[in-house]
């Protein structure tokens, strides 16, 4: 029996279809990449775990519960790969939970979240622009990130800048819960002559934020706000976990995991 384990940690989603297309998709790819490690997974969102348990009778462990199982089964070599987008609050809390079990492992390594250094920005830009529609001068593509009060939130502005630096002037990045917000994006787009806007989530899953805050029919959704300003709006409800090239970056981070 191997003494090696792989723990894949996600924020989670209560949407079955997008869970299968994104989180479980990445989990399967990572599990296949590390056949010498027993696979474990965990979600960090207590609200989502509670909803899955009570509504769907699906039991997924949180990080501490998964770690207890890993220790109980006697594994001493652990690789942890998060599917988080950035090194934000969720990733910090996840690492703290894992490290509280450090004494049980002879080897413990963490892979990086999706966007960790500058090379990740350019990799993701290349991956997404190959997958998404080519834009005319009258078309724009707007990504909705989650956003955070954590200092790592600055990566969204860096990503927007990097899109433009790499020859994609009609691509914009905003967030639903922080800065740059939709108002900031709209101000940058003003006077550019755009008629048609593509809207896409910059999130692992196309879940609640994508379905409601981005593409919902309420007047305060991004789609509705763009339409109210005279733009034609098309929503691309596809989580990042559906893109094979994005999954490959998570694999790369896992292969380059840093020991602690």
Language-model regions, residue ranges each:
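Active-site-proximal alpha-helix that buttresses catalytic centers in soluble enzyme cores
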Residues: 1-260
């Amino acid at each position: 029996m191997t003494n090696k384990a792989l723990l894949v940690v996600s924020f989670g989603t209560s949407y079955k279809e997008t869970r299968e297309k994104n989180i479980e998709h990445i989990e399967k790819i990572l599990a296949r990449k590390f056949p010498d490690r027993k696979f474990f997974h965990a979600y960090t969102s207590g609200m989502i775990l509670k909803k899955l348990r009570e509504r769907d009778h699906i039991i997924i462990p949180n990080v501490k519960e998964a770690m207890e199982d890993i220790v109980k089964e006697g594994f001493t070599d652990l690789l942890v790969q998060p599917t988080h987008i950035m090194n934000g609050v969720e990733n910090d809390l996840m690492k703290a939970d894992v490290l509280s079990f450090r004494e049980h492992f002879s080897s413990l390594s963490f892979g990086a979240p999706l966007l960790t250094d500058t090379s990740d920005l350019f990799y993701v830009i290349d991956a997404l622009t190959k997958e998404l529609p080519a834009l005319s001068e009258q078309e724009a593509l707007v990504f909705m990130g989650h956003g955070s009060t954590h200092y790592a939130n600055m990566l969204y502005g860096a990503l927007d800048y990097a899109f433009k630096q790499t020859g994609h002037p009609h691509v914009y990045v905003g967030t639903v819960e922080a800065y740059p917000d939709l108002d900031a994006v709209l101000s940058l787009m003003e006077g550019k002559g755009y008629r048609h806007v593509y809207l896409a989530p910059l999130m692992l899953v196309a879940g609640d934020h994508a379905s409601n805050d981005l593409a919902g029919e309420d007047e305060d959704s991004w789609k509705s706000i763009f339409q109210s300003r005279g733009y034609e709006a098309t929503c691309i409800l596809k989580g990042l976990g559906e893109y094979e090239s994005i999954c490959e970056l998570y694999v790369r981070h896992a292969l380059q995991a840093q020991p602690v």
